[in-house]
């Protein structure tokens, strides 16, 4: 496996670990999620370029579209939470609070 792919997989793993460790704040979770999406985009682009697969050239673009939608929804949720509660704690999102 080339070193570039290994580094990108390591970046994805680090972002996933960050998502699991820093899950109390929404901003940290969104940043880790963006890191995961970026590493998936780069890895899929490199894989398609190495395999010379012409049928799946649109897959990285589709992944970027989903990442942009996820970022927009996440930022809207973050602004709504900070205006309502003054915090970005994920526990404020629970509907089962007493």
From Swiss-Prot:
Which keywords, in A-to-Z order, does the entry hold?
A: Electron transport, Membrane, Mitochondrion, Mitochondrion inner membrane, NAD, Respiratory chain, Translocase, Transmembrane, Transmembrane helix, Transport, Ubiquinone
Q: Which GO terms describe its molecular function?
A: NADH dehydrogenase (ubiquinone) activity
E.C. no: 7.1.1.2
UniProt effect for mutating residue 94 to N: In strain: Isolate NARA4.20
GO cellular component, alphabetical, reads: mitochondrial inner membrane; respiratory chain complex I
Topology within the bilayer: Multi-pass membrane protein
Q: Which InterPro entries match?
A: NADH_UbQ_OxRdtase_chain4L/K, NUOK/Mnh_C1-like
User: Which reactions is this enzyme annotated as catalysing?
Assistant: a ubiquinone + NADH + 5 H(+)(in) = a ubiquinol + NAD(+) + 4 H(+)(out)
| UniProt enzyme class | translocase
Name the residues that span the membrane.
Answer: 2-22, 29-49, 61-81
- Kindly state a single biological-process term from the GO annotations of this entry: ATP synthesis coupled electron transport
Where does this one sit in the cell? Answer: Mitochondrion inner membrane
Q: Which domain of life is it from?
A: Eukaryota
- Pfam families found in the cross-reference section: Oxidored_q2
Q: What does this protein do?
A: Core subunit of the mitochondrial membrane respiratory chain NADH dehydrogenase (Complex I) which catalyzes electron transfer from NADH through the respiratory chain, using ubiquinone as an electron acceptor. Part of the enzyme membrane arm which is embedded in the lipid bilayer and involved in proton translocation.
Quaternary structure, per UniProt, is: Core subunit of respiratory chain NADH dehydrogenase (Complex I) which is composed of 45 different subunits.
Q: Which family does it belong to?
A: Belongs to the complex I subunit 4L family.
PANTHER family per record: NADH-UBIQUINONE OXIDOREDUCTASE CHAIN 4L, NADH-UBIQUINONE OXIDOREDUCTASE SUBUNIT ND4L
Q: What is this protein called?
A: NADH-ubiquinone oxidoreductase chain 4L
Species assigned in the record: Lepilemur seali
Which gene does this sequence derive from? MT-ND4L
């Amino acid at each position: 496996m080339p070193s570039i792919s290994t580094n990108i997989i390591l970046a994805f793993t680090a972002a996933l670990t960050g998502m699991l460790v820093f899950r109390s704040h929404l901003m940290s979770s969104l940043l880790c999620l963006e890191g995961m999406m970026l590493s998936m985009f780069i890895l899929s682009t490199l894989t398609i370029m190495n395999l010379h697969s012409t049928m799946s050239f649109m897959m990285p673009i589709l992944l970027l579209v989903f990442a942009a939608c996820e970022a927009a929804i996440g930022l809207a949720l973050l602004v709504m939470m900070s205006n309502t509660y003054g915090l970005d704690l994920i526990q404020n999102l629970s509907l089962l609070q007493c």
